[in-house]
Amino acid sequence: MKRVVLAALPLALVVGGCGGGGPTTSPEPSPDSGRRSSPGTPAGSASGRTGSAKATPGKKIAAMNLRLRDAAWANDVARARRLIRQGADVNAKDDTVQSAYLIATSEGYLDLLRLTLRAGARINDKDSWNGTGLIRAAERGHGLVVGDLLQAGIDRDHVNRIGYQAIHEAVWLGEDTASYATTVRVLAAGGARLTDRSPSTGLTPLEMAHERGFGGLESILRSVTTADRPTDPEAALLRAAADGDADAVAVALRAGADIEARDEHDRTALLLAATYDHVPVAKVLVAMGADPDAFDDRHDTPWLVTGVTGSVAMLETLLPADPDLAVRNRFGGLSPIPASERGHVAYVRRVVQTGVDIDHVNDLGWTALLEAVILGDGGRRHQEIVRILLAAGADRAIADRDGVTPLRHAEQRGYHEIAALLRR
């Protein structure tokens, strides 16, 4: 009982979280941020009167840095990019010790984070809690951000001023959910120390999970801290990916496995995970930088396979890895084509929103619309896919190599409902 009380005190202390928060409404000036103008007062003006002295270069930069932080809070990547090009500093902080870079880490803004890293973010910069971006991201369960930071070389085991490392915050201040499960696995895969006791609680991450009643996180931590180091990390990685064992994937990566290792069919771990729809495995691999466009000996990639399986969950998992939507399979097709043929309604509904070319013609001379008609069964699933494709702007006039249009194919097959859709 005594240990529970000791452990609970720091949790109450930081119940609001150690990082992030939100934009302050009326911050005081700080050395590198400049003074925020009052409402209605032009930036760089001391009084709000027009005709005041021209702003100094320092004040202009301070105002620009303020606008950059505002853009960061709004996750307005385009505006942030413009400001950075104009000279705004991704490391400039306000009086609450927030910078555009640190905001990206706590809020889980992956594209913004990548922008700030390219713009020279100080990877080990600290917030007001003396915490790194890794600690902030781990606390919020942002596994993808955690993965990018680990790949960028951030200090994996820094202790903030209340005695927590990133792994401690992910468990003690987190939740027993899928996002935190991914975060813990990614920290393990990236080599974070997993058995250190928090100076403030006296607990290891495993003990923290037990105290919080987080059975899922406790199981993960027990698995990754007690597993034997694999003698062949690459073989262990591929086997774990095929089996859907996300904990074993983390252990293999922790042991130094090449994330792009191939099996006898040139399949990577991510391709195996996509093929068998092992989403938790894919989440760890994507966070750690696995390639969504790696071809196997059948000219399949992790992304292309989603069109065959129809897994929307896997599609969503792979999108942050920035897959090439124009990559073609061995038939010269893009992922919407096999999905349309196979009647994967939910997948087609989602993939048409990605910007993929829905009028792409494969080596057989067929578009997704043609395949939905020619290789479909004319039933409700294929009717809905035709409806989705047309609503997304698919060109119903594109004919096959024999000059036969989708409408003519539908009429020849007696698919009256589909023909009616195509006549509209």
Model-derived features with residue positions:
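Start-of-repeat signature of ankyrin repeats
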Residues: M64, V97, N130, G163, ...
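Ankyrin-repeat inter-repeat connecting loop/turn
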Residues: V90, I123, R156, L194-T195, ...
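Leucine-rich solenoid repeat scaffolds
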Residues: L194-T226, R396-R424
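Bacterial signal peptide processing site
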Residues: G19-G22
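Ankyrin repeat structural motif
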Residues: D76-I84, Y109-L117, H142-L150, D176-A189, ...
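C-terminal motif of bacterial Sec signal peptides marking the signal peptidase cleavage site
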Residues: V15-G17
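Ankyrin repeat boundary/linker residues
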Residues: I61, D94, D127, N160, ...
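Ankyrin repeat A-helix N-terminal signature
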Residues: D70-N75, I103-Y109, R136-H142, E169-Y180, ...
